[in-house]
């Protein structure tokens, strides 16, 4: 009976390992080619992945992660919270617009349909619904940090913008200084007059918890912080600070 139990446990472990190995695989592309990301119901001929790069595929040969061949508009996982409703396209051709004005560039707004332009030659990761969990954005994006709370932040282009599966922001680069709550603020900033909001520096990387609290970022000004053991520390400005389980580290 004991041998049977051991056999069953080993068999289950082997089956689990086989299933996990079957669920995802990688492939190096010998040429730039059209591949279909997971969650797509209609293939896009313009969505190509770069030659010589590695793509991660699921069991249906759909792309989980891959390197884009060129800039392309895709829908981010947090698209419901994004307020980029239009993008501008400029042209000074004699054929566009119809009335030609020499040395004049005309910008015309086009609806985005909740899409964001992602940068080519950079990796993107797709969620199971076909939206982009993470990728390098090629335009500034203004979005609610948490899907259930009010508050808009603009993230810089040319940097990665990541989302949690529920659409809340996971990480990005702040365009401007912003007042935000660090993770663990209830104990770390007990009695604070600003209700736990402190200023984080723009032009720096930042990451958030699913609830919209800062888990790492660069402070604009030094602040006092109470660690879980009750000790008080000064967190310096212009330094990347991590907030983990109520403890601040740098």
Stretches with model-predicted labels:
Residues 1-8:
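Bacterial N-terminal signal peptides that target proteins for export
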Residues 3, 21-24:
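N-terminal Sec-dependent export signals
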Residues 23-250:
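Glycine/tyrosine- and acidic-biased, solvent-exposed loop/turn segments at the edges of beta-strands
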């Amino acid at each position: 009976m004991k041998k049977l139990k051991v056999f069953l446990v080993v068999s289950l472990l082997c089956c689990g390992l086989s299933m996990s190995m079957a669920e995802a695989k990688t492939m190096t592309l010998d040429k730039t080619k059209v591949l279909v990301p997971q969650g797509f119901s209609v293939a896009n001929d313009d969505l190509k992945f770069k030659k010589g790069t590695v793509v991660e595929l699921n069991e249906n040969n759909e792309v989980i992660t891959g390197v884009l061949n060129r800039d392309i508009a895709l829908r981010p996982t947090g698209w419901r919270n994004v307020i980029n409703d239009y993008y501008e396209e400029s042209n000074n051709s004699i054929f566009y617009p119809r009335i030609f004005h020499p040395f004049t560039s005309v910008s015309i707004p086009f609806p985005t349909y909740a899409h964001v332009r992602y940068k080519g030659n950079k990796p993107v990761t797709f969620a199971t619904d076909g939206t982009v969990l993470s990728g390098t954005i090629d335009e500034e994006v203004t979005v609610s940090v948490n899907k259930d709370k009010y508050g808009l932040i603009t993230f810089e282009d040319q940097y990665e913008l990541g989302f949690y599966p529920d659409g809340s922001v996971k990480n990005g680069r702040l365009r401007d200084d912003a007042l935000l709550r660090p993770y663990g603020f209830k104990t770390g900033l007990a009695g604070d007059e600003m209700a736990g909001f402190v200023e984080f520096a723009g032009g720096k990387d930042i990451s958030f918890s699913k609830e919209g609290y800062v888990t790492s970022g660069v402070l604009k000004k030094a602040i006092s912080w109470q660690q879980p053991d009750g000790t008080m520390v000064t967190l310096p400005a212009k330094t990347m600070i991590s907030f983990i389980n109520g403890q601040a580290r740098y």
